Amino acid sequence: MDLRYHEIIAVNVAPFLYLLAAGAYAAPVEFNRDIRPILSDRCFICHGPDAGTRKIKLRLDSEAAMLADLGGHKAVTPGDAEASELVKRITADKPALRMPPPYSGLKLNAREIELLRQWVREGAKWQKHWSLIPPARPDLPAVQNKQWPLNPIDRFVLARLEREGMQPSKEADRATLIRRVSLDLTGIPPTPAEVDAFINDPASDAYEKVVDRFLTSHRYGERMAARWLDAARYADTNGYQSDGERMMWRWRDWVIQAFNKNKPFDEFTVEQLAGDLLPGSTTNQKIATAFNRNHRGNGEGGIVPEEYMVEYAADRMETMSTVWLGSTIGCARCHNHKYDPFTQKDYYQLFAYFNNIADRGRYFKYGNTPPFMPAPTPEEQAKLDAMDRKLSDAEKRYQDLDARIESSLRDWVNALPNAKPADWAVSRGLVAAIPQQTFDGSKYYDAGKLRAFGYLDSFSISAWINPAAPTGAIVTKGKDVAEEAGIGLVMQNGKLQLNLVLRWLDDSLRVETRDAIPLNKWQHVVATYDSSRLASGIRIYVDGREMPLKILVDELNQDFRTAEPWRIGGGFGKDFLFRGSMDEVRIYGRKLNAEEAGMLGIRDSLNQLASRPARSKAEQSKLRFAFLEEHADAEIRQAWKERNDLREQRERLIASFPTVMVMEEMPKVRDTFLLVRGAYDKPGERVTPNVPAVLPRVADGMPNNRLALARWMVDPANPLTSRVIVNRFWQTYFGTGLVKTVEDFGSQGEWPSHPDLLDWLAVQFSTSGWDVKAIQKMIVMSATYRQTSRAAPDLQQKDPENRLLARGPRMRLPAETVRDQALAISGLLVERTGGPSVKPYQPAGLWKELTGGADYERDKGPALYRRSLYTFWKRTSPPPAMMNFDAAGRETCIVRENRTNTPLQALNLMNDVTYLEASRKMAERMMLEGGATPADRLAYGFKLATSRNPRGKETEVLLDSFRHQLDLYQTDRGAAAKLLSQGDSPSDSKLNASELAAYATVASLILNLDETITKQ
């Protein structure tokens, strides 16, 4: 806890609730502010938008329905409360007549009844829901205290305070202020030097300079990205039972850079929702679309893929609705929304925008599931650019030799008919070549344990075959049992099959040629696999012609690599022993292209080909390749080899790049149906993409696809997006949004504490180029933000949640910042922007409890000390320390920040190796940087954590604690050694161990202070 004494006050939230309601405003009653919340909470469940649950056909969510003649009476008769059935029912004495009915458990208190009665008396004026009315910039309100406001925000806040007979608090001291804004904008506390520089800067713009420096820091993007990752449900695993690892961190890098570069929020929106559909879309714009691939993906066997295709599209749509619209339209999946004007048809029309993605219902258990793309880092892209320049030079050198090549090739071919016999075959990537074999159906040829291939390897199998029976194995690698793990190129009923199997049918690929091949005839077959883990990545050629394929099984999720030997003519069980002959069986460690497959299918020698007056394209290619590789002069051979080597190096480089799952439209639009009760297998009415009917229409003149939806999101006519986003920005700095229910701007959501301020900020944001940094700078530059957070008892009693903003924000730090601050204070923090996720300290054995028993292998070295933003996030076992401090679980979209206080948090700070190690490294800083005396060193450590010097009694407490701990560790040097061994970082052996341990214990005390883990 804070070393300063705070009296614990039991507070009642009722006074503030009263302030928010009609009693805080002069008459007349306002429908949106005062009446709609009552009707929504107590009446809409039976008399709202959902016809399925509506009683006696009475609607109270519609003005027309509310005023309609119900057979000689009306629910509401404007101006006449006594004639209104609504008022009669809510005041009825008889339980059988009273509304809400007693059995519902819903009640109206006396004040709410009087509000409804007063509203009817005043004419029952109806309003469209406030959030559905486009925001207009309100005039700045007049205020009495004209000296206090520093920008327009303050005018709105002060006007409300003055109406309540309240005054704002004084400005926080500079040490508090710089710590507050540093934690808010960067997630890292200021250094003592930064604090002192700010305190001693007499310039009138000293604070603004601090704000500008933090806004331009690379730390800013990391701080802002943390909350966006919560909203986007980012994780490093797929979720569900298997919860295998995926690779999405390049999207996280994109988010960080977008914030750091101050990408306008409209572009930020469009690129994430539809960057792939932008004309000439760039790699980065496609990476941005990973926002909508961050949802969970089920790789379990036995699932119904169609069911999960629906779940994924629903997740995308509902996440989009929460993040940009502050909408609970997800409640309309099975029926019309019970509170808001969203129909089930609205739901599925929005759903349709996300139902045309070329993904699959069953995700790969490990790795990324298509569609995905290479996503090189800037450093990797620089390597690729350099490689492309080298390749371009090599291509030019080769092309410059073209005339000489053609002349030399012609001379060589003309001489071949009279030359000694010569032949050539594709050799690049060749693993093995097996000569001619004859099989009688009783045995196979064991080729031994040649190179093994797995599902992330490309490979090819080539062979001349002369089959005598329609079924038989050509080349296999696996146990001599049908459908066991491994590779199998076989014939079955005359058709060629390639099988890649870990476990049949659960983890396997099987493709088959549509047509059978003839028996008792020599023919050449090639089967290739491209490492995609998809059946579409397989090709089969017969005599150089690509064969039409039928996909029989496309469910490969795990690696089929096996140590079993390669077998020629068998290996799939006795029923697949080959009968006939084979020759020139070749195995390649890469995917052969169509041209290479064609050349391998030419059995004639080079001499024979050269003797022909006319040659096929494949025959001409075989002559040309043979010449360039083996018979041209040295300069030509070198140019040819250099070009091919660089092409191969480029392929390997691209294959080494990280990938990211992205959005990609299907070429043919998938039909979308309204699903009865939300069930995937109960399609109803066919629907087309559209936005909810209650909202403005999508602009005409462009395809009605995700790009149209994305642009509609940031269209000035959209009443929600700008409000929703600035409200979440406000939550970042004040802990609570102007609308507390940041995820719900509907009827069940909260009325804004400052509606005019919300609208002013929304309009300012959208009309100033959607400038994220500018709107956030305005917030932190305001006098409202800069107030002290200390609250007198009367203010605490009147406004316990600080919704009226008569004081500055004070709240526990976010989970990431608690840890990052400890790393920064201790000097352990490794600041590297972007990159793969890391695995810092975590209690042993947590992952083993999960299905599959995978163990958590923590990192070593610098990776242990990266910012928490980069911590590996396993959905079924999130980082436990982060969860203790209320981090979002990342299973679904979370936009409201949660804060609790539990004993587990204190236990975490006192015992987790992260904080023990930080304490001892902080102690080293205290001894090496803090001065010569214990008092100076302890004051330095205190300032590292709190940005201020300890006060009199605080210094005494720190010194007493240090002396006590020093006595203990001088007596028990083993305990000192044990403490100083916590964590991987080395301890400074030059420092006295007992003294260092004593300082480390006090450092732990400081890191546990309420003031340390609180922004105030």
Language-model features and meaning:
Residues Y240, K261, T289-A433, F572-G573, ...:
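Active-site histidine-acidic residue metal-binding/catalytic motifs
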Residues G52-T53, T77-E82, A92, G123-W126, ...:
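Extracellular/periplasmic catalytic domains that process cell-envelope and extracellular macromolecules
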Residues Y25-A159, R163, A175-R180, P190-D196, ...:
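Solvent-exposed helix-loop boundary motif
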Residues Q144-R180, D184-R219, R233-P279, P341, ...:
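Primarily short, surface-exposed interaction patches in extracytoplasmic proteins
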Residues I113, K396, D400-S656, A822:
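Extracellular glycan-associated modules
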Residues D2-L3, E7-E30, R117-A142, A226, ...:
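Post-cleavage N-terminal segment of exported redox proteins
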Residues D984-Q1016:
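Short, amphipathic C-terminal "tail helix"
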